[in-house]
Amino acid sequence: MRVAVLGAGAWGTALAVLLASKGVPTRLWARRKAQAEALKAMRENRDYLPGVALPAYLYPTHDPEEALEGAELAVLAVPSKALRETVAGLPPAPWYVSATKGLFYGEEGVRTPAEVVEALTQRPVVALSGPNHAEEVARFLPTASVAAGPEDLARRVQALFSGPTFRVYTSRDRRGVELGGAVKNVLALAAGMVDGLRLGDNAKAALLTRGLKEMVRFGTALGGEEATFYGLAGLGDLLATAYSLHSRNRMAGESLVRGVDREALEARGVVEGLYAVKAMVAWGKEQGVELPVAEAVHRVAHEGLDPLAALKALMAREPKEE
């Protein structure tokens, strides 16, 4: 089997390294020609995963035709804001694995990355999601993930990616798996604000617990199964993202406390939570569903509210039964 990995950031590179280390011929497509040439010459992704050697079975390329030639499937590991453009601009693959985490909101309502890819390509899509930091996957530290989609294809993804340090579970709840992976980025932004304000462990535990409740409320209303949000793709991913030094979203929350604005954060790299929170809040307002943590994050990130004022407002909400 030959695999194309589309997207040569940290996550795409880590997945390509994982596959190639198992002897799977893997072509890693980089959007920028200069990056592809550097990957070939240095056998290392110094921009996104410094110190990780590229295995012999990993071949970087800037040519989309070359990347997809003979590939049985394509793994999509691009930022959500670039997903539509990337898929529309590349030759189709027989089927896809979406490793992108994010949300889309428009006239059709809330859509997940796999749903967007499926609509654009009319090909089957499996979502791969979980508490998976690229830095740890690429260094073969123990990791678990979830492959969600059509049962036969999810099992093929399970077999393809599973190994001594990467354990894959299957799920039929693709929508729930993807919603969990998107919402946890919003909650990680909030956790980063708590860290930046030095509000302590009690505050962070309370925020994340209530945030998990919000994830379940949002996710089940959109068709996800409640159990999914208490598994690897929900709670598991939330824990990894909200506490990790690797987490771009948690660090972005800290940066917002220090006065770094949204535009400056986006210039440093994609912060998926900044996009997902817009979709969550827009949907919540349309449906009349309360999402207080997401609304607080939105007010800080997109409306300029002081982070401490936003968190104080959460504490001042009307008392209620848990």
Curated annotation (Swiss-Prot):
Residues bound to NADPH: W11, R31, R32, K101, A134, R248, V270, E272
Active site, renumbered: K184
Pathway(s) served: Membrane lipid metabolism; glycerophospholipid metabolism
Keyword Aminoacyl-tRNA synthetase: no
Subcellular location: Cytoplasm
Family classification: Belongs to the NAD-dependent glycerol-3-phosphate dehydrogenase family.
Role of this protein: Catalyzes the reduction of the glycolytic intermediate dihydroxyacetone phosphate (DHAP) to sn-glycerol 3-phosphate (G3P), the key precursor for phospholipid synthesis.
Protein name per the record: Glycerol-3-phosphate dehydrogenase [NAD(P)+]
Biological classification of the source: Bacteria, Thermotogati, Deinococcota, Deinococci, Thermales
